Curated annotation (Swiss-Prot):
It comes from Chaetomium globosum (strain ATCC 6205 / CBS 148.51 / DSM 1962 / NBRC 6347 / NRRL 1970). Belongs to the peptidase S10 family. It is a single-pass type I membrane protein. Residues 477-487, 630-643 have a biased composition (Basic and acidic residues). This is Pheromone-processing carboxypeptidase KEX1. Glycans are attached at N436, N444. Disulfide bonds: none annotated. Residues 471-502, 556-643 are annotated as: Disordered. Residues 1-30 form the signal peptide. It is found in: Golgi apparatus, trans-Golgi network membrane. One of its GO terms (cellular component) is trans-Golgi network. The chain crosses the membrane at residues 520-540.
Length: 643
């Protein structure tokens, strides 16, 4: 006779057995219970006095099989103008965090020091919800197994659409917003690819339409050939290099090598022989400073100099505060950063950039004509940027054919005029537009235009989105094109918080939110019912066993043993597979993180420029260390040794 468990033994093992029986359902329950409230940021260390901007932050899984999670930081709009809008912002790299945009460019706060935030006058969340995403996986606070970094642009875009679908399920009240993608530098590749996938998704049967209304790309890396050829032209026009000089002759030789490579090679996002042009400009124009240190031009703002070979990677000055702030334990906890992410925040992750090698991807310039047939696009450029300079952008526009014409030609021999832009009485730049494409040049601006001119870029954004402030009041800014005031926009504060239309919009959004919560509650009830049924079945079998059903008792002992073993197994696995490093903990955080431009230092061909990237080691300050570029990583050759 097979003995049955004593009554005391049965109840002693009951918690373990019940846990084993219900563990799969518990995992599902936990996922179902994840709601917008779990991402709500209740407080933000160092925030200025007064009401906190409503925000949510955290991770969304995009590739469960490789622990791929994208981090987001969402700020709600301060006012609703005539409609709801959402702007998704991406920085470049590849591998540079969009927290650059959040804390140094268009977010509601900027850092006064590494502990104190202050309001950003000109933040983009005045009339639009703004969503910052560390993209692709591995960038900033995002993470992924170290053998699963993204390599191609389509792969990146596919993962981003997954992120958006899951994000809208959490926040359904935003799914019907007018949607805009914005970013800078290497985001000039990201944004068109994401837009292509969003437009394709909208054409699929049974999908909710996302109201993609426009793209904004600042100092974008879009068409490599035009940008490579513009380096030397820009250097001549800015007086960095004198025409006819020995330096000019050497650079012209490298340009011809590049042109030959472009003529025989396939269209690609990067061409190593052409990358050397920028590297050579920085090397050959370096000079000795007052302290006898070798100095070079800042490739992101040629009005400035930097110690060679950094050439701009110590810029902007706000970087000195951003990394310490985002590594604070209380900040990490406030933003719901997964504690399993074992490395601290870095501006530009060199591992992401080194693995992102889109050899199968075409440059995004190939996508723009089709996108322009459906969606307005705005390209804007800071006039003092070298690495993704405005001359290259103007060349790609002139050569591109879209919507029945080429470039800004309105008719044979007639081009769209460049309209002088003044902002609050100052010359701000110029605007040019035709057939769904708008181009804006910002005078006295760097690679990171919003860093230099937050108010002007907010005015640009509001005009592009068609913001109408008549419904909310506020003093319109004095912004003119050729002396004429256009639609009224406002930069700074507004007179009031809205009208009946705004209240109706808020009521509609609230209803959508509660509907999502109701659906989540129904799912939870179903899961609890299933778990209860499993427990009831277990109790029924135990009672039958104690009544002496020998065969059943024998089977029950085997089943119980299997369940107990399963419980032990679950403790060591995740999702039915062995747990792997969320993000390789053996990564050497003393290495300098880089962008896409390899350092021009002699003997350091594997290092990369990373627009303003800083070392992961706060104490690493040695001259000659590798570095990279915050917007677009570019491969460069060797640099001459310092004399």
């Amino acid at each position: 006779m097979v003995p049955s468990w004593p009554s005391t033994g049965c109840w002693r093992h009951l918690p373990v057995v019940l846990a084993a029986l219900t563990l799969p359902w518990t995992a599902t329950l936990a996922a179902a219970e994840k709601s917008a409230g779990d991402y709500f940021v209740h407080s933000l260390p160092g925030a200025p006095e007064g009401p906190l901007v409503k925000m949510h932050a955290g991770h969304i899984e995009v590739t469960p099989e490789t622990n791929g999670n994208l981090f987001f930081w969402h700020f709600q709009n301060k006012h609703i103008a005539n409609k709801q809008r959402t702007v998704i912002w991406l920085n470049g790299g590849p591998g540079c965090s969009s927290e650059d945009g959040a804390l140094m460019e268009i977010g509601p706060y900027r850092l006064k020091d590494d502990k104190t935030l202050m309001y950003n006058d000109g933040a983009w969340n005045e009339f639009a919800n703004v969503l910052f995403v560390d993209n692709p996986v591995g960038t900033g606070f995002s993470y992924v197994d170290t053998n699963a970094y993204v390599r191609e642009l389509d792969e990146m875009a596919e993962q981003f659409v997954i992120f958006m679908e899951k994000w809208y399920k959490l926040f359904p009240e935003y799914e019907h917003d007018d949607l805009y993608f914005a970013g800078e530098s290497y985001a000039g590749q990201y944004i068109p690819y994401i837009a292509k996938h969003v437009l394709a998704r909208n054409k699929e049967a049974g999908t909710k339409q996302w109201n993609l209304k426009g793209l904004l790309i600042g100092n974008g890396w879009i068409s490599p050939p035009e940008q490579y050829e513009a380096y030397l032209q820009f250097a001549f026009e800015k007086g960095l290099v004198k025409k006819g000089s020995d330096i000019a002759s050497k650079l012209e030789v490298q340009l011809r090598i590049c042109q030959k490579d472009l003529a025989v090679g396939e269209s690609a996002v990067d061409h190593p022989e052409c990358e050397k042009i920028l590297q050579e400009i920085l090397k050959l124009t370096a000079t000795r400073g007052k302290d006898n240190k070798l100095e070079c031009y800042n490739m992101y703002d040629v009005r400035l100099k930097d110690v060679y070979p950094s050439c701009g990677m110590n810029w902007p000055s706000d970087l000195a505060n951003v990394q310490p702030y985002l590594r604070r334990k209380d900040v990490v906890q406030a933003l719901h950063v997964n504690p399993n992410k074992v490395t601290g925040w870095v501006e530009c992750d060199g591992r992401v950039g080194q693995n992102f090698n889109p050899v199968k991807s075409k440059p995004s310039i190939d996508l723009l004509p089709d996108i322009l047939s459906e969606v307005p696009v705005m390209l804007f450029s800071g006039a003092e940027d070298l690495i993704c300079n405005h001359l290259g952008t103007e060349a790609l526009i002139s050569r591109m054919a879209w919507n029945g014409g080429r470039g800004f030609e309105l008719s044979p021999g007639t081009w769209a005029p460049r309209r002088d832009w003044t902002f609050e009485g100052e010359d701000a730049g110029f605007w040019q537009e035709a057939r769904n494409l708008t181009y804006v040049v910002f005078y006295n601006a760097s690679h990171m235009v919003p860093y230099d001119h937050p108010r002007r870029t907010r005015d640009m954004l509001d005009r592009f989105m068609g913001v109408d402030i008549s419904s909310i009041g506020g003093d319109p800014t004095d912004s003119r094109l050729d002396g004429e005031k256009g639609p009224e926009t406002t930069v700074g504060g507004t007179a009031g918080n809205g009208n009946a239309d705004q209240e109706a919009e808020k009521a509609k959004l609230s209803a959508a939110k509660w509907e999502a919560y109701r659906r989540s509650g129904e799912i939870v009830l179903v899961i609890v019912a299933v778990a209860a049924a499993a427990w009831g079945y277990f109790v029924w079998r135990e009672r039958r066993k104690r009544r002496g059903y020998q065969g059943l008792a024998s089977a029950e002992n085997g089943a119980a043993g299997g369940v107990m073993g399963g419980n032990s197994g679950f403790r060591n696995t995740h999702g039915g597979r062995p747990r792997s490093d969320v993000e390789a903990g053996d990564f050497d955080e003393t290495q300098l993180d880089s962008l896409h431009v390899r350092s021009p230092v002699e003997g350091q061909e594997d290092a990369r420029y990373s627009l303003g990237a800083v070392s992961d080691d706060d104490d690493e300050e040695e001259e000659g260390s590798a570095a990279g570029a915050k917007g677009k990583e570019k491969e460069t050759g060797k640099a001459a040794e310092s004399s």
